């Protein structure tokens, strides 16, 4: 390349000396043109400059595509392989990520189910604990003590007209909702009353006063009237001894002659007079 440029510099001053119009002087023009680039318009196609340059350019052109031809086919293959490797790596990462995400979902689902089971078990325990106090029947305590439930207290019964202990009262027919003990039936207060010993004597005295014979002597009736007045009082009963005494006094009064006739006329015997019943024949004669 340096030799060709030197040849061109030497040939140009010779040509330029023949044509002085193109430059100022022959000497000066040659020196200037040697330092500057060659004139392309002044050269012909048959000049050796282009002939020498053309093959070199062709050689460069031929070698340059050849190098690109050798390099270009290899680069797509490398890019393709790297791309495949990258895609495989991404797919592997995707698989790993998917597995990790799936494991996390499974763990969260297990934790949720475990928490639900614990919550259900806790709720069941709470229900049992809350239901256990309800099974115990609490007895309410009022501020004022009950007169009927006090220990060792007595209550006045208007029907019996006496004081009765709280244990002797009959139980209520309606069971109490607060007491859980079984109700025990107590003895009726009516059965607790002892029968009166003077009851049959009172009835006997009343029957004797109602069925009194009318044919007794006046003295006997007077004596009996005082006894009847005593019997009419409540709570007074005449014993059998007093009745025997009245009968003996009646017998002694019959010893007088004036009174014997009156007593002998009566058909009633002393035994019948003492009995409270009157025969049917006597009632029919009356």
UniProtKB/Swiss-Prot annotation:
Q: Name one GO biological process term.
A: positive regulation of cell growth
Modified residue Phosphothreonine is at which positions?
148
Q: Where is the composition biased (Polar residues)?
A: 258-269
Q: Which residues form a coiled coil?
A: none
| UniProt superkingdom | Eukaryota
Q: Which UniProt keywords apply?
A: Cytoplasm, Isopeptide bond, Nucleus, Phosphoprotein, Protein phosphatase inhibitor, Ubl conjugation
UniProt GO MF annotations? protein phosphatase 2A binding; protein phosphatase inhibitor activity; protein serine/threonine phosphatase inhibitor activity
- Location relative to the cell: Nucleus; Cytoplasm
- Quote the biased-composition stretches of kind Low complexity, using this chain's numbering: 177-187, 245-256
The protein's PTM annotation reads: CHEK1-mediated phosphorylation at Ser-36 negatively regulates its ability to inhibit serine/threonine-protein phosphatase 2A (PP2A) activity. Phosphorylation leads to its release from the PP2A complex and its sequestration by 14-3-3 proteins in the cytoplasm resulting in its inability to translocate to the nucleus, where it otherwise inhibits PP2A.
Function, as annotated, reads: Acts as an inhibitor of serine/threonine-protein phosphatase 2A (PP2A) activity. Inhibits PP2A activity by blocking the substrate binding site on PPP2R2A and the active site of PPP2CA. Potentiates ubiquitin-mediated proteasomal degradation of serine/threonine-protein phosphatase 2A catalytic subunit alpha (PPP2CA). Inhibits PP2A-mediated dephosphorylation of WEE1, promoting ubiquitin-mediated proteolysis of WEE1, thereby releasing G2/M checkpoint.
Family statement: Belongs to the FAM122 family.
UniProt protein name: P2R1A-PPP2R2A-interacting phosphatase regulator 1
The species this protein was found in:
Rattus norvegicus (Rat)
